[in-house]
């Protein structure tokens, strides 16, 4: 592939996820403000059991773990390099667990978490319908699912062409998959913003 533009906002779905590109992406976006903004925009309780799908180097996981200090936070990512980086800086957080995993095959038991987040990752899922089915499998009844995307390109979510290109598309697919109480709100911090979709398992 061609060279990657240095320090330039790109559509990450265009990347080939080899180790070199994963390291580059982790350096550029691993601690992006969207992680903090997402966690700050949802309610996290001390006893929550939370899963981050596509956790990257674990920035959001580590922020969330400080809030659910009596619970557990799982982070999964299909890229081994990302998980290695996440574990390197994990220190001694006993309520954090990182592992290689995909949205289509979540390595957790049925109804084992009460909240799931996906930050700038749902457009990477190879089979989003299967991924949404897995989300419902591991969520408890009435569990919450949050999908966060950066606000770019004049209020678009910048995912590029595809079935989940716009927030309207994502909301439609969540409805088809059987989620309820679907809402969409925008949040901003330091001139950066996110679209945050919230929905609930039946």
Stretches with model-predicted labels:
Residues 51-105:
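Class I SAM-dependent methyltransferase SAM/SAH-binding core
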Residues 49, 143-144:
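Short glycine-centered segments of the SAM/dcSAM-binding site in methyltransferase folds
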Residues 104-115:
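A short acidic, Gly/Pro-enriched loop at the edge of an enzyme's catalytic core
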Residues 186-202:
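Core SAM-dependent methyltransferase catalytic element
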Residues 115-127:
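A short SAM/SAH-binding and catalytic strip from SAM-dependent methyltransferases
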Residues 129-141:
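A short glycine-rich, Lys/Arg-flanked "PGG" loop and its adjoining helix->strand segment in the class I
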Residues 1-43, 59-63, 89, 146-169:
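Conserved class I S-adenosyl-L-methionine
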């Amino acid at each position: 592939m061609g060279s990657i533009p240095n320090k330039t906002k790109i559509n990450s779905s265009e990347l080939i996820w080899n180790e070199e590109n994963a390291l580059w992406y982790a350096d550029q976006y691993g601690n992006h403000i969207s992680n903090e903004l997402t966690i700050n925009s949802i309610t996290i309780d001390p006893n929550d059991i939370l899963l981050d799908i596509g956790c990257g180097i674990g920035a959001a996981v580590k922020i969330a773990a400080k809030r659910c200090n009596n619970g557990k936070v799982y982070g999964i990512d299909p890229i081994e390099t990302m998980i290695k980086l996440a574990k390197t800086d994990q220190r001694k957080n006993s309520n954090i667990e990182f592992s290689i995993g995909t949205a289509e095959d979540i390595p957790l038991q049925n109804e084992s978490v009460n909240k799931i987040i996906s930050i700038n990752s749902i457009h990477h899922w190879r089979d989003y319908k299967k991924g949404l089915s897995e989300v419902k499998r591991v969520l408890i009844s009435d569990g919450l699912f949050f999908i966060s995307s950066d606000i770019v390109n004049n209020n678009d979510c910048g995912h590029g062409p595809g079935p989940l290109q716009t927030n309207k598309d994502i909301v439609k697919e969540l409805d088809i998959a059987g989620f309820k109480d679907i809402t969409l709100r925008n949040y901003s911090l330091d001139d950066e913003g996110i679209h945050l979709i919230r929905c609930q398992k039946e």
